[in-house]
Amino acid sequence: MTIPLISGLGAIADKYDAILCDVWGVLHNGKAGYPAVADALAKFRAKGGTVLLLSNAPRPSTQLPKMLESLGITHGAYDDILTSGDATKTFITTHQLGTKYYSIGPGRDNNLFDDTGVQQVSAEDAEFIVVTGPFNDEEEGPEDYREPFKPLVARGLTMVCANPDIIVERGDKHIYCAGALARLYEEMGGKVIYFGKPHGPIYDVARAKLAGLRGRAVEDARILAVGDGIATDIKGAAGAGLDALFITGGIAAAHVGDHAEAPDQARVIEYCEKAGLKPIGAAARLTW
């Protein structure tokens, strides 16, 4: 297997009409934005390309522009945003699992449930569970939830996972996401419904959004997925039949080089081979 190290987006931009770009780990690290990434995406758009930010954020996409702006990422870097929170909210609104839910996650995610017609209740009264992350992601991990999960699994409650990510960066620290809790719930015998990367439905919605933005459908061969998560961004792109550019300076940095900004090609290849995936290339950061 050969996975080239790409010098910049400009070297491959002509092959694509649209980019599905991850947010956390590519555009920012949770505390600071990467200005060169925003510049690269803006240049792609200036050449006629379309950029759809595809995020596993467990909140509506309407919340992200303000957050991105605070990190120095302006709207000039993208055309639109699609989040796993959008897909989760759409599903919850159907009331397929009922109208009474038990929420696991920080209070900042509560607006996910606005205008959905569902009611937050105690674990004992719930008809289903929604997980957006640990209650305190600075300190908690999945094992903190093993005991609380036991009665929920025993009752057969379905868990809706609004963010399939296992971990993300926050500054120089790794924190657990909803996907880590959902994985444990499944391992304990519980049923989980996932929304977001790497699961197929989010890519169908993304294709439809791209078609709306460009006025016509975009061929899969002309769509490039960009992300730092091998198990979400790169795996999801492969499952959807899309090319993927692997950003190694995010959560995989320690696995593929001694320095985040200088990936070792042999280690990148080994890391991807272990995952059974072959992105079209890799780069420490997305630059032009």
Tell me the role of every PLM-derived stretch.
Residues 2-23, 28-47, 54-82, 86-288:
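Asp-based, Mg2+/Mn2+-dependent phosphohydrolase catalytic module
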